[in-house]
């Protein structure tokens, strides 16, 4: 796959970022290089290789799933423009 300036401009538009026109050609070359590396990764023979997520065995301690108020509801509600009974008060948005 090869990217040109028009494709870079379209990607920038979709990502809602501004890329100056004079940088689009350079960015297209960089993205083409990255895509080349990704294509090379696709050529690697991984048959028989077990997937791993980490090279360190990790086990997480389990804890009880208990609902709490976090210990400081007053501080949390203090950030709200308006609150009532430890809850944020917001305008009604659905009729």
Curated annotation (Swiss-Prot):
Catalyzed reaction equations: L-glutamyl-tRNA(Gln) + L-glutamine + ATP + H2O = L-glutaminyl-tRNA(Gln) + L-glutamate + ADP + phosphate + H(+); L-aspartyl-tRNA(Asn) + L-glutamine + ATP + H2O = L-asparaginyl-tRNA(Asn) + L-glutamate + ADP + phosphate + 2 H(+)
The EC number(s) this enzyme carries: 6.3.5.-
Entry GO MF terms: asparaginyl-tRNA synthase (glutamine-hydrolyzing) activity; ATP binding; glutaminyl-tRNA synthase (glutamine-hydrolyzing) activity
InterPro entries per the UniProt record, alphabetical: Asp/Glu-ADT_sf_sub_c, GatC
Record has RNA-binding as a keyword: no
Superkingdom in the source lineage: Bacteria
UniProt KW keywords: ATP-binding, Ligase, Nucleotide-binding, Protein biosynthesis
GO term, biological process aspect, one: translation
Pfam family name, one: GatC
Keyword Lipid metabolism in annotation: no
Function of the molecule: Allows the formation of correctly charged Asn-tRNA(Asn) or Gln-tRNA(Gln) through the transamidation of misacylated Asp-tRNA(Asn) or Glu-tRNA(Gln) in organisms which lack either or both of asparaginyl-tRNA or glutaminyl-tRNA synthetases. The reaction takes place in the presence of glutamine and ATP through an activated phospho-Asp-tRNA(Asn) or phospho-Glu-tRNA(Gln).
Protein family (similarity comment): Belongs to the GatC family.
Subunit-level organization: Heterotrimer of A, B and C subunits.
Entry protein name: Aspartyl/glutamyl-tRNA(Asn/Gln) amidotransferase subunit C
Organism: Rhodospirillum centenum (strain ATCC 51521 / SW)
Gene responsible for this protein: gatC
